[in-house]
Amino acid sequence: MTAQNILFNDGWQFCLCDIGTELSALPGRHWYNVELPHDWLINDTSKLYETGEGWYRRSLPCSAEQLSGRVLLNFDGVYMNSTLFVNGKEAGSWTYGYSAFEHDITDFLHEGENELLLRVSHQSPNTRWYSGAGIFRDVMLKLRPAAYIGTNGVYIHSAPQPEGGWTTEVETDVVGEASDIRMLLEVFDPAGASMGGYGLEAHFDGGHEKFTASFNSTDPELWSVDDPMLYTLKISLYSGSELLDCVNETFGYRTAEFDPDRGFLLNGEPVKLHGVCMHHDLGALGSALNEAALARQLRIMKEMGVNAIRTSHNMPARQLVQLCDEMGLLVDSEAFDMWEKPKTEFDNHRFFTEHAERDVRSWIERDRNHPCIIMWSIGNEINDTIDPHGLDITKRLYEYVLKYDPKGNAAPTIGSNYMGDENAQKCSDVVKLAGYNYSEYLYDEHHA
């Protein structure tokens, strides 16, 4: 069996209940058909911040062949605090509303029809802006053979060499059962023409194992805001002559540096960042991802002179990053608006301590190959940074970023409105790159 990715947005039903509704109470409820992505709050403007528990239901038919491998359910975003049930049994949960996640549901399935139920607990207030509620980004059904390339398992880093040309390093995570494998890497230029292939053969011991390869490019076309040239790396995984998996990753050749005297340098040249902060909602359309509406927003930004986007104040949809790659928009990708100290009663502070690393891992691993991303922002206006414990959290988040982007495809940063505070300055000194929110009066003093 060869790996398949199937967009899984159709065929869902929805039911809105009170918080704490039991599974046993669901059959008698009124269900109606919905198409994902879905935001249940936007339909009634008098209840845009209403507490409620949304349930999503879908049937999943499975064959014996599919169950011989692994069956994964991937969610690009569910707002928030969701729990998945498969055939009445809890199969996994995820708390943060903006980070992508995946559940391996194989062991809960049987041949024939299976029932999927996703509970989404939305308690207000939980944010400082309109969040929406529900499965507001894409869902993907992933069918995998005995050995396959892990989700977000390809890591690409390109760097210019002193003697000329560029070297690209590729790390591929293989998951599953032991096998003798063959991996073929093929690169395509921005016009779609093949630039050649590179192969490796190895024995995969099973579990998780990373395989590395590298290749050189003499004179690649660089990615920039005016000319966003994108290359494609195709990785094919074989066992003997059988194709197990195939992944296409876009990437770009570019350097991104921050210098205290010269500012931001893209490909060695100073670029003034004309940026805006963009929340994830689409105005009257709500929070449900609509790629055409999102592309329209970004085109308007580009036309008004914007060259940089800050994803305020959370991980963006996968499509936003892809569009910014294609349109030549730089991205400050932000993860959190709060850490352990709350800004609203039911926000992510409830889950941060336990789940911060898995959220950072999801965030970084999904998007680390995108040339548009130049910064990883670990937080916005974080209240914790004025206390000594906030320094410990800063160091921990910084280490997570380096753990999942060790080659430094983008730079860690933080947006702070406490830069006059000594402890906040210590936090900023950890990441070395800080946003001075409402602190223009400190620019000259701190630069000196």
Give, region by region, the residue ranges found by the protein language model.
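Beta-strand-rich binding/interaction modules
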Residues: 86, 165-202, 209-213, 235
